[in-house]
Amino acid sequence: MECLRLARAALDEMLAHARAAHPEECCGAVLELGGRDVVRRFTNIQARLHREDPASHPRDAETAYAPEPKELFAALREGEAPGARVKVFYHSHTRVGAYFSGEDRARAMFGDEPAYPEVTYVVVSDSRTPGEVRAFRWDEGARDFVEVPIEVC
């Protein structure tokens, strides 16, 4: 499977976002705009969701994320412009390494299909293994998300 090519500045921005959000998880997207990788940070509203309805949202923002819908939709619209695309959705793990958890997979799915099959999901760790970054993409043959190498350029 093809690797994820990611600009150094975008990777650095994702890591900075994770450090700034700690001890909460961060989330965002990388858009490809005119051949450049541009990071869009999203507000993690998981703490508010948990506070307002802990039965429906049992995890707080230290162990889960929920992007602010208006920010997410703005990035999706921006990615639909000519010469643009949503390249990456990213989030951080604050207490564990950078792996694609069952919760991450569930959030990336729409029923039995990936919600955004063309988008790569990046998980960064800012605690247990600071700076660890791993990428995952849908593999139709495996019917699952598989790890792909990251080429930083």
PLM regions and their residue ranges:
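Conserved beta-strand-loop surface patch within small alpha/beta domains used
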Residues: 1-86, 97-153
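Histidine-centered divalent metal-coordination motifs
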Residues: 91-95
